[in-house]
Amino acid sequence: MTDRYVYDLSEGSAEMKPLLGGKGAGVAEMKRLGVPVPDGFTVTTEACVDTMTRKGEWPEDLESEVWDGLKRLEERTGRVLGDDKKPLLVSVRSGAVISMPGMMDTILNLGISDDTVEAIAKEAGNERFAWDCYRRFIQMYGEVVEGIDAHIYEDALTALKEKKGVESDTDLSADDLKGLVDTFKKLSNEQLGGNWTTDPREQLMRAVDAVFRSWLNPRAFVYRKANKIPDDLGTAVNVMQMVFGNRGDTSATGVCFTRNPATGEKELYGEFLVNAQGEDVVAGIRTPRSLAEMEEVLPEAYHDLIDTMKKMESHYRDMQDMEFTVENGKLYLLQTRNGKRTAAAALKVARDLVDEGVITKEEALMRIEPAQLDQLLHEAIDPDHSEQPVAEGLPASPGAAVGEAVFDADVAAERGAKGEKVVLIRFETTPDDIHGVIVSQGVLTAHGGMTSHAAVVARGMGKPCVAGARGIKIDAKAATLTIGDTVIHEGDMITLDGSTGEVFASGLKLIPPQINADFQEVLSWACLLYTSPSPRDQRGSRMPSSA
């Protein structure tokens, strides 16, 4: 136990991960290394655990410590939460000790209100940006903190875009967004009986509490059970000054990996969106652009990012998964963590890091979980088939998936639990679909990219995934997938090739797996390192049981 619950960013380090969570410790370590990160503070995992122990009641000193942390942040930034001249806006994000991508909650743009929106617009010289932040905040806060159904906001947004004749949120004007904010406020008050709070300090307290509660939500339980993560670790809460990827054409947000998490190759891998905020990428709301294109759009930030990727992989001696924002051309890092990867990628990365002299063979073996190796023993599509793909998307997670099409995560979970082979098809997956993803043979989405939550979770579980498939139309109510003249109904057979991104409207034949050179090489290390000629050594010789 520590004697306090709140730590400023400058007080943390990578070694404090059990206390500050992965995100808080990772950002603190980046700051220590001179990487540009937003300022902030972290509420510890112990605060969450103590709150759960007290059945949701905060420990006695926690609220005052949060206020003290906020005051110090305000002094460092020269901004004040709720101020109508120089307002402070913050993000409130979860941060588990063991990475759980997308399973817990985030609130962005907290601090924006009727009292501050004009000051934000004036300072930025961009009225549209300010009202975009405001509508995003109301929706995110309403869903996460107040429990308002997401479709209430989404339906209003969709109706506005249809009325204006536009397809993308970015096509809406400042006046359009101002009207949307009024609509969102009205809808929120209707749902809450007029009890929507506008006090940013109260909103901050409730947001921190909502992140604590998200540790206990059903999808988090399902993910922890599937990945054998203890339920008593709790989550930290990171309160950080907002940096904005939605300030215009010189701003962006994205996710990158220092190596390919699907194959393990040492190559550029990532995605970004111009004029967007982070949740747009990881939630799969918009299909992002390849990171390689960023060099043309934001060259200075791109080269800074490449340098930072190299620096962080060298520091952690492992493949990193990083989130970043570019605000008016300046790069900020929001997160770094050891990246989720497929079994094939785990072997490739481990072997290459040994060859590069970064880690030893013993370290490499300890990083490969025995359960992962089972993924390499799955069947593959017979290359001699004559079928033509009906659609192609992004090869988000490799492998072959053959099963009956289903369009609802609950249906997938029910049928999968009976041992039936199903492929989950969604417009975009959300973290709430995790129970359906776990039992499916594979996942197909119409939207989202290779760094969306769907892709990251699928790779970590060894599930084939094709994301952002072009030209497909999904009708969830009718349970149909339409691609040109081809219509796939629920129960029809479908095949996904997560290695190529191809989709086939039939069940293709599968063949036994082929053991690759990386697998053979790593097994040879195990034989050499864990088989000793000494009788005494032989008695204790064994492969490591876990990473």
Identify the residue ranges that each predicted region occupies.
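Hydrophobic alpha-helical segments, chiefly the membrane-spanning helices
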Residues: 542-546
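Protease-associated
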Residues: 358-440, 502-510, 516-529
